Amino acid sequence: GRFVPVSPTPAAELPDAEFPMVLITGRVLEHWHTGTMTRRSFVLDALDPEPWCGMHPDDLARVGVASGERVALETRRGRIKLEARADEGVAPGSVFMAFCYHEAAANLLTQPKLDPFGKIPEFKFCALRVEPA
C-alpha cells in the first residue's frame, strides 16, 4: 500500500448560535454496538442501565445542571432527554452520547448526510444545544 494525501472536508453541519455545541456518538464498555446482545445480559445492563451523556463540568455549569440531573439534547432533527454526567475527558463544547440505548436513540439527533465517496452517514458529529430537562 501507499499513502495518498487527502484534503480534509468540513462536517455537513457545524455549531452556530442556535446549536452551539457538538454531539459525538460512540460506544461504552458495558454495551457493545447497539446493545442488542449486551443489554440482554442482566449483569452488564445493571452496570449502565439508563441512557446518559457525558459533558465537561464547565459546560454542565453553563447549562445550569449538576452531574446526575437530566438534560434535553436537541438538534435540527430531534430532541431527547437523559441524564448528564460530568466528564473531564469530554472536550468543552462537546457532548458524548452512547448509541446503545433505544430509550434515547442517538440517531434521532444525528446528521444523516452521506459521505460522497464512502456513502457512510455522518453519525459521529452534529450541531447540538443542551437545556435543563
Model regions: which residues?
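Long, low-complexity segments enriched in small/aliphatic residues
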Residues: 1-43
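Long, contiguous, secondary-structure-rich segments that constitute the structural scaffold
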Residues: 18, 34, 39-54, 58-133
